[in-house]
């Protein structure tokens, strides 16, 4: 039997209100709340403000990461949510972001990561991990 180690959501959100995505000050609380809504464990986060507008950010999660880039002039947010463990956590975080940003359209892919790993193949000898 094969198992996947995580789920990866890659999304383009179109038609987002520029006021919500023009500054890191505006969008960072949305992303921080998405982490909480997704029951994810934040290790750290970093946000960057572009001039005159636009923002990027990344949150390092115990489960993996959440990142985004905004283009307010196009009403566009590109989003990346990758989590290991409970797959519904990524969905909850994604759903929250969609609910708050209210894009007019969304193009997304949801991939299982590491899906070719066989369940019965594991390194059990600690010396092999060095």
Swiss-Prot record:
Description of post-translational modifications: Is synthesized initially as an inactive proenzyme. Formation of the active enzyme involves a self-maturation process in which the active site pyruvoyl group is generated from an internal serine residue via an autocatalytic post-translational modification. Two non-identical subunits are generated from the proenzyme in this reaction, and the pyruvate is formed at the N-terminus of the alpha chain, which is derived from the carboxyl end of the proenzyme.
Residues spanning the signal sequence: none
Pathway as given in its UniProt record: Amine and polyamine biosynthesis; S-adenosylmethioninamine biosynthesis; S-adenosylmethioninamine from S-adenosyl-L-methionine: step 1/1
GO cellular component, one term: cytosol
EC numbers for this chain: 4.1.1.50
Keywords assigned: Autocatalytic cleavage, Decarboxylase, Lyase, Polyamine biosynthesis, Pyruvate, S-adenosyl-L-methionine, Schiff base, Spermidine biosynthesis, Zymogen
EC class (word): lyase
GO MF, one annotated term: adenosylmethionine decarboxylase activity
Cofactor(s) demanded: pyruvate
Family: Belongs to the prokaryotic AdoMetDC family. Type 1 subfamily.
NCBIfam families, per database record: SAM_DCase_Bsu
Record protein name field: S-adenosylmethionine decarboxylase proenzyme
Lineage: Archaea, Methanobacteriati, Thermoplasmatota, Thermoplasmata, Thermoplasmatales
């Amino acid at each position: 039997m094969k198992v996947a180690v995580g789920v990866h959501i890659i999304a383009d959100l179109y038609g987002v209100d520029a006021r919500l995505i023009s500054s890191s000050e505006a969008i960072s609380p949305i992303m921080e709340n998405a982490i909480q809504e997704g029951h994810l464990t934040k290790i750290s986060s970093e946000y960057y403000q572009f001039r005159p507008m636009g923002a990027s950010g990344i949150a390092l999660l115990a489960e993996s990461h959440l990142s985004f880039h905004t283009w307010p002039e196009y009403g566009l947010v590109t989003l990346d949510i990758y989590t290991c463990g409970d797959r519904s956590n990524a969905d909850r975080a994604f759903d929250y972001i969609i609910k708050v940003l209210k894009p007019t359209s969304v193009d997304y892919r949801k991939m299982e990561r590491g899906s070719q790993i066989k369940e019965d193949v594991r390194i059990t000898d600690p010396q092999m991990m060095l």
